[in-house]
Amino acid sequence: KTGVDVVIELPFYAAVQPSHIFSAGAVRLVAAMKCDWLAFGAETLEIDYQKLIDNQPKKDDSFKQFNRPYASIFQEYLYSRTGIRIDKPNDILAFGYANANMLIGSPLHLVPIKRVGSAHNDHQLSSGLISSASAIRDQLKNGHFDIVRKFVPESSWRTFSTAKVIDWDQFWPLLRFELIEAPIDTLHSIYQMTEGIEYRLKQAAIESETFSQFLQFVKTKRYTYTRIQRLCCYVLLHVTSSEMLINPQYIRL
């Protein structure tokens, strides 16, 4: 109905992850289906992915600067070595796809497609027909279903207009309870719970009345909003580090 022949589920172990793990999970799935081509959006089409791959750091130890997120340090390192900037969301994913494809023997022919219309993080609806997912989600959260109708397939609009839109405000009471009641040792076992961040999360849950306040309390230069929200998903679902090492051996349509 919307021009798509088949949709493949990207499992949780890859979907709720930083961009390099997200993209690697997607590439492995597509390769496992014996596909020959992989098309993806990118802000910049003329990127020498091989040059970036050849110049990435061999070890991550040199990037442990506690006042900055790893991604920005990594991007600056690549720019200093190659003169190529990959600081836009889709370009970052595109590099992840190219790198993951190389690691499994390059079975896929990569086809970057120029992103048009709104940028990934735009929160205002476009005057044209293509808007960012962020802008559409903001409108849905505020109950403006009719406004987004021209930007989404009709089947999607019917779902949005009849089903309740869920966001972090609905999950906050459950998350807050978990963070306050769980022992520190239990929180420490959660995936990506590093550098003692569990103490900061627990204190933030005690002192914050809303999820927005909680995010403001926890955020630092090193811990971005996106990383904190991924960590909250792991806490809600009790996801441990050992569980995330097990890659599902299935393809779900």
Give the residues covered by each predicted segment.
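Active-site cores that bind ATP or allylic diphosphates and position pyrophosphate for catalysis
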Residues: E9-L253
